[in-house]
Protein backbone atom coordinates (compact mmCIF):
# COMPACT_ATOMS: atom_id res chain seq x y z
CA UNK A 1 0.00 0.00 0.00
CA UNK A 2 1.23 3.46 -0.82
CA UNK A 3 1.91 5.74 2.12
CA UNK A 4 2.62 9.35 1.26
CA UNK A 5 4.15 11.95 3.49
CA UNK A 6 2.15 15.13 3.97
CA UNK A 7 3.69 18.59 3.73
CA UNK A 8 2.46 22.14 4.11
CA UNK A 9 3.60 23.94 0.98
CA UNK A 10 3.52 27.70 0.62
CA UNK A 11 2.22 29.37 -2.52
CA UNK A 12 4.58 29.13 -5.48
CA UNK A 13 5.00 31.06 -8.70
CA UNK A 14 6.31 28.92 -11.53
CA UNK A 15 7.41 29.69 -15.08
CA UNK A 16 8.06 27.15 -17.80
CA UNK A 17 7.03 25.67 -21.14
CA UNK A 18 3.76 23.81 -21.61
CA UNK A 19 2.51 21.17 -24.00
CA UNK A 20 -1.03 19.91 -24.55
CA UNK A 21 -0.68 16.14 -24.53
CA UNK A 22 -2.39 12.80 -24.34
CA UNK A 23 0.74 11.38 -22.73
CA UNK A 24 2.62 10.08 -25.75
CA UNK A 25 6.14 8.96 -24.88
CA UNK A 26 7.84 11.56 -27.07
CA UNK A 27 5.90 14.57 -25.75
CA UNK A 28 7.56 14.61 -22.33
CA UNK A 29 11.23 14.46 -23.42
CA UNK A 30 10.53 16.94 -26.23
CA UNK A 31 9.02 19.60 -23.96
CA UNK A 32 11.78 19.03 -21.37
CA UNK A 33 14.37 19.63 -24.12
CA UNK A 34 12.68 22.92 -25.03
CA UNK A 35 12.45 23.93 -21.37
CA UNK A 36 16.10 23.10 -20.57
CA UNK A 37 17.28 25.12 -23.58
CA UNK A 38 15.20 28.13 -22.46
CA UNK A 39 15.89 27.82 -18.72
CA UNK A 40 18.67 30.41 -18.84
CA UNK A 41 16.15 32.97 -20.17
CA UNK A 42 13.94 32.81 -17.08
CA UNK A 43 14.65 35.65 -14.63
CA UNK A 44 14.08 35.59 -10.87
CA UNK A 45 14.63 31.82 -10.47
CA UNK A 46 14.66 30.95 -6.78
CA UNK A 47 16.55 27.65 -6.96
CA UNK A 48 18.13 26.63 -10.28
CA UNK A 49 18.78 23.07 -9.04
CA UNK A 50 15.07 22.34 -8.50
CA UNK A 51 12.72 21.76 -11.42
CA UNK A 52 9.04 20.93 -11.37
CA UNK A 53 6.57 19.51 -13.82
CA UNK A 54 2.98 20.59 -13.27
CA UNK A 55 0.15 18.71 -14.93
CA UNK A 56 -3.11 20.63 -15.27
CA UNK A 57 -6.23 18.51 -15.72
CA UNK A 58 -9.17 20.57 -16.91
CA UNK A 59 -12.39 19.70 -18.66
CA UNK A 60 -10.26 18.61 -21.62
CA UNK A 61 -8.96 15.70 -19.57
CA UNK A 62 -12.48 14.44 -18.92
CA UNK A 63 -13.58 14.94 -22.53
CA UNK A 64 -10.44 14.10 -24.52
CA UNK A 65 -7.98 12.48 -22.07
CA UNK A 66 -5.58 15.38 -22.76
CA UNK A 67 -3.93 17.76 -20.33
CA UNK A 68 -1.30 20.49 -20.08
CA UNK A 69 2.16 19.33 -18.96
CA UNK A 70 4.54 22.09 -17.87
CA UNK A 71 8.21 21.67 -16.90
CA UNK A 72 9.01 24.75 -14.83
CA UNK A 73 11.01 26.45 -12.09
CA UNK A 74 9.90 28.51 -9.13
CA UNK A 75 10.39 32.27 -9.50
CA UNK A 76 10.13 35.20 -7.11
CA UNK A 77 7.98 37.26 -9.47
CA UNK A 78 6.10 37.21 -12.75
CA UNK A 79 7.54 40.61 -13.76
CA UNK A 80 9.46 39.30 -16.78
CA UNK A 81 8.05 36.17 -18.39
CA UNK A 82 10.02 35.16 -21.50
CA UNK A 83 8.18 34.85 -24.79
CA UNK A 84 6.50 31.46 -25.40
CA UNK A 85 6.68 30.64 -21.69
CA UNK A 86 3.79 30.22 -19.28
CA UNK A 87 3.40 31.48 -15.70
CA UNK A 88 1.20 29.76 -13.13
CA UNK A 89 0.46 30.21 -9.45
CA UNK A 90 0.39 27.13 -7.26
CA UNK A 91 -1.73 27.65 -4.12
CA UNK A 92 -0.54 27.07 -0.58
CA UNK A 93 -2.01 23.85 0.78
CA UNK A 94 -1.32 20.56 2.50
CA UNK A 95 -0.07 18.14 -0.15
CA UNK A 96 0.37 14.37 -0.21
CA UNK A 97 3.86 13.52 -1.47
CA UNK A 98 4.73 10.21 -3.11
CA UNK A 99 8.37 9.25 -3.74
CA UNK A 100 9.41 7.41 -6.90
CA UNK A 101 12.77 5.64 -6.95
CA UNK A 102 13.76 4.30 -10.34
CA UNK A 103 13.71 4.99 -14.04
CA UNK A 104 11.19 7.48 -15.43
CA UNK A 105 9.25 4.81 -17.31
CA UNK A 106 7.95 3.70 -13.89
CA UNK A 107 6.33 7.06 -13.11
CA UNK A 108 3.03 6.34 -14.94
CA UNK A 109 2.59 3.22 -12.80
CA UNK A 110 2.95 5.32 -9.64
CA UNK A 111 0.33 7.77 -10.93
CA UNK A 112 -2.01 4.88 -11.65
CA UNK A 113 -1.56 3.48 -8.15
CA UNK A 114 -2.10 6.92 -6.57
CA UNK A 115 -5.34 7.63 -8.43
CA UNK A 116 -6.77 4.10 -8.65
CA UNK A 117 -5.68 2.61 -5.31
CA UNK A 118 -4.54 5.15 -2.75
CA UNK A 119 -6.93 8.05 -3.37
CA UNK A 120 -10.19 6.04 -3.38
CA UNK A 121 -9.29 4.31 -0.11
CA UNK A 122 -7.60 7.26 1.61
CA UNK A 123 -10.59 9.33 2.66
CA UNK A 124 -9.08 12.32 0.86
CA UNK A 125 -10.39 14.15 -2.20
CA UNK A 126 -8.53 16.14 -4.80
CA UNK A 127 -8.44 19.82 -3.86
CA UNK A 128 -7.09 21.06 -7.20
CA UNK A 129 -7.12 20.04 -10.86
CA UNK A 130 -3.34 19.61 -11.08
CA UNK A 131 -0.49 17.59 -9.70
CA UNK A 132 3.15 18.46 -9.42
CA UNK A 133 6.41 16.57 -9.82
CA UNK A 134 9.62 17.62 -8.06
CA UNK A 135 13.04 17.00 -9.61
CA UNK A 136 15.97 18.05 -7.42
CA UNK A 137 19.56 16.85 -6.89
CA UNK A 138 18.27 13.35 -6.06
CA UNK A 139 17.12 12.93 -9.66
CA UNK A 140 20.23 11.99 -11.61
CA UNK A 141 19.21 10.50 -14.96
CA UNK A 142 16.09 9.21 -16.69
CA UNK A 143 17.42 5.64 -16.80
CA UNK A 144 19.10 5.53 -13.38
CA UNK A 145 17.35 2.97 -11.14
CA UNK A 146 18.52 5.01 -8.11
CA UNK A 147 17.01 8.32 -9.32
CA UNK A 148 14.45 9.89 -7.00
CA UNK A 149 11.60 12.25 -7.83
CA UNK A 150 8.41 13.16 -6.00
CA UNK A 151 4.80 13.56 -7.03
Which residues make up each language-model segment?
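A solvent-exposed interaction/effector surface
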Residues: 1-151
Amino acid sequence: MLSPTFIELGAKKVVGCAIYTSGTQTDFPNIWDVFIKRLKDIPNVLNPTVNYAVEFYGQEFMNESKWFYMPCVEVSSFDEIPMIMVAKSIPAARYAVFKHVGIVSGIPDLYSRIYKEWLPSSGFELAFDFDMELYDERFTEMDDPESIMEI
